[in-house]
Amino acid sequence: MVEFRTTDQLQAGLAEVERSPIDDGTLELIVQRPATDEREVLDEAALSATEGLVGDSWNQRGSSRTDDGGPHPDMQLNIINSRFLALIAGDPERMALAGDQLVVDLSLGSADLPPWSLLRIGDSVIEVTDQPHTGCAKFTKRFGLDAFHFL
């Protein structure tokens, strides 16, 4: 059985998360979601302006943030800080469960990476949008309510 981190444990690990680099981060993990609740860890991937992470199912997922309930074009890629994810996941094998396609060792705070910033990942340049990526019910189930509130 998985033990979720408590708020106190998360607070204790926050200093390490805050040591994330502001520039010159590292791509630590690429996770493709070929279908709902499926994960495939990749060594490399292609990014596309129309598809996001090629082979990912983001374009089959509806959004409450669009008028028609369809996929949100500003939410093709989800990025999470690797230090934060390691803190909440505990076991490295659980990191792919987060649902974020790109796991980076980089400060992702809005002060360091505000909306419309450009971020180079390999040969690709992505634009940070103004769409927040907050946890969902699946995130809470996988990592606990304290981790959800800690986002």
How does the language model describe each region?
Residues 1-151:
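Metal-cofactor-dependent catalytic cores
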